[in-house]
Amino acid sequence: MASAAASESSSSSSSSSAGAANGQSAGESGGGGAQDSTFECNICLDTSKDAVISLCGHLFCWPCLHQWLETRPNRQVCPVCKAGISRDKVIPLYGRGSTGQQDPREKTPPRPQGQRPEPENRGGFQGFGFGDGGFQMSFGIGAFPFGIFATAFNINDGRPPPAAPGTPQHTDEQFLSRLFLFVALLIMFWLLIA
């Protein structure tokens, strides 16, 4: 019984080797020859166009791999196994029945055109871009600011007007003003006794 199983396995291996000698692989002899003859790109997972294969053995479309390499110029690694990869470390793959024998690495996909949206027109004087943006800058030494003239005449002051008396915002501002005055008086008193 063991000899029958051994002879059966040897006959099946000889028939598969005969099929391989005729140019058929095991996948093609099953009737799916057209489906197994295409290769999939490891980036877009679609049928590869202008196929290239890396030295580590992974297959890619050249446009996909080119975009991968262009977006990572400082760290060029294989998308699958992270081995070193570059334009010179890939091999073009030509299949049976392909019409073009041109190296796909020679044709790089065109770079997309940049689009610049037009800036919004706010109108009026921008004050070098600082007036409307809520940015205010003043400088001085101690209690003597150099912007006294600009502060006194309210030139290019982007702050809102003070709150009207009697509103909740006005009472909150008055409370904070008194609180900070009290803290300042405490600090001055502490400096005097220290």
Swiss-Prot record:
Residues 1-32, 92-126 are annotated as: Disordered. The keyword Transferase applies. It comes from the Eukaryota. PROSITE patterns: ZF_RING_1 (PS00518), ZF_RING_2 (PS50089). Residues 1-27 have a biased composition (Low complexity). GO terms for molecular function: ubiquitin protein ligase activity; ubiquitin-like protein conjugating enzyme binding; zinc ion binding. It catalyses: S-ubiquitinyl-[E2 ubiquitin-conjugating enzyme]-L-cysteine + [acceptor protein]-L-lysine = [E2 ubiquitin-conjugating enzyme]-L-cysteine + N(6)-ubiquitinyl-[acceptor protein]-L-lysine. A zinc finger (RING-type) spans 41-82. GO terms for biological process: autophagy; defense response to virus; ERAD pathway; innate immune response; positive regulation of type I interferon-mediated signaling pathway; protein K27-linked ubiquitination; ubiquitin-dependent protein catabolic process. Pfam families: zf-C3HC4. Pathway: Protein modification; protein ubiquitination. The keyword Coiled coil does not apply. Its main location: mitochondrion. Its EC number is 2.3.2.27. PANTHER family: E3 UBIQUITIN-PROTEIN LIGASE RNF5-RELATED. The RING-type zinc finger domain is responsible for E3 ubiquitin ligase activity. This is E3 ubiquitin-protein ligase RNF185. It comes from Danio rerio (Zebrafish).
